A protein has these predicted regions:
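Alpha/beta catalytic cores of nucleotide-metabolism and tRNA/nucleoside-modifying enzymes
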Residues: 2-20, 24, 28-29, 34, ...
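N-terminal small/glycine-rich loop or linker at the start of catalytic domains
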Residues: 22-27, 62-83, 117, 124-125, ...
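Short, solvent-exposed helix-helix connector turns and helix-capping sites enriched
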Residues: 67-71, 134-135, 201, 249-250
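Alpha/beta enzyme core
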Residues: 47, 97-125, 136-214
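Active-site beta-loop-alpha junctions enriched in small/polar residues
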Residues: 33-35, 59-61, 89-91, 116-118, ...
Length: 338
């Protein structure tokens, strides 16, 4: 048994943000994370609360048209999750209009376009960072989205390519977003080729916010409220905050940012609860992989967490995985100070 040891706040760091006529309170968002922010994890996050809205995993536009959106773990929803933003990766070769019309029928909080994913496989399909790079195709995709959808539209970006003049194409795209009717901009301040070990450039948030009339959400490397309160000059111009990897490590993390009281945490119970949720939403073989991915993050709560995540990677099936994980978690492993 442990506890939520975040210092917490007396009020949310970011009180509210309007997505057109819908106000999200607080303006704290779960980031889209491949393999993690599926329906089962979003349900677990909802159990703890503190967030304002959640993003789905990055959904393939072409695959989405073949899925039953009410059953797919990418897009199925439960009330406890709160407002949900559906994030897509797409190119101008996709059936953009059909994808957006199908997504709009689900009545999400917003539809989001991923323009930052640097994975080679994604870029080879002319989406993610590759779509950001191709101005004409990006403009075409945004125009086609808006031709069939008037609801809240957001985009998630990085800084672009690491050239000396990176600010010029960045500003050109900010202007494009405004002209195309984008409502909210999320910025992860790393360049397209940078891995996550490179520190996010929080110091760029004020400049970015000053260059656009769009509300800006900040994303990248924030793990505790003190990161924000200790860098007010960087975060004060933002309209909201997006948390990713840190929330996968500690699904209760949003409570501290929202000013909610800390709660006692039984790490074994939390892991086991997600195991059950995941089996409800995925077939066993896919649930195994999803829980292995989650455990890589969750193991970071412990001083010797590497023993946990290495052990679960060789599990034969979901039941073997559960046996291995609970043997570690129920033994009272030493907590690491996050």
């Amino acid at each position: 048994m442990g506890e939520d040891r975040g210092q917490g706040l007396t009020r949310p760091l970011f009180d509210r943000l309007a997505f057109q006529s819908t106000v999200v309170t607080p303006a704290l968002f779960l980031a889209p994370m491949a393999g993690v922010t599926h329906s089962a994890f979003r349900r677990l996050l909802g159990d703890f609360g503190g967030h304002g809205a959640v993003f789905t995993e990055m959904v393939s536009a072409s695959a989405f048209l073949k899925e039953n959106a009410d059953l797919s773990p990418f897009t199925k929803r439960r009330p406890i999750e709160g407002p949900v933003v559906i994030q897509f990766r797409m190119s101008d070769e996709d059936r953009v209009e059909a994808v957006i019309e199908k997504a709009a029928a689900l009545a999400p909080l917003a539809i989001d376009l991923n323009l930052g994913c640097p994975a080679p496989k994604i870029q080879q399909q002319a989406s993610g960072a590759a779509l950001w790079r191709d101005f004409a195709r990006l403009a075409s995709v945004l125009r086609r989205i808006r031709s069939v959808y008037a609801g809240p539209l957001s985009v998630k970006v990085r800084l672009g390519d690491p050239t000396e003049d990176w600010r010029t194409p960045f500003l050109e795209r900010l202007k494009l977003f405004e002209d195309a009717g984008v409502d909210v901009l999320t910025v992860h301040p790393r360049f397209s080729d940078e891995k996550l070990k490179r520190r996010a450039r929080w110091e760029l948030f004020p400049w970015i916010a000053d260059q656009t009339r769009l509300p800006v959400l900040g994303n990248g490397d924030v793990t505790r409220p003190e990161d924000v309160s200790g860098h007010t000059e960087a975060f004060a111009p933002l309209a909201g905050l997006m948390l990713g990897r840190a929330a996968a490590v500690r699904p209760w993390l949003f409570r501290a940012f929202a000013g909610l009281p800390p709660v006692a945490i039984d790490h074994a119970e939390v892991w086991d609860r997600l195991w059950g949720y995941t089996l409800e939403d995925f077939p066993p073989e896919r649930a195994l992989r999803r829980m292995q991915e989650f455990t890589v993050y969750f193991a970071q709560n412990f001083t010797f967490g590497h023993q946990l995540y290495k052990a679960v990677q060789v599990a034969r099936d979901v039941h073997d995985l559960r046996r291995i994980a609970l043997a570690f978690l129920e033994a009272g492993p030493q907590l690491r100070r996050n």
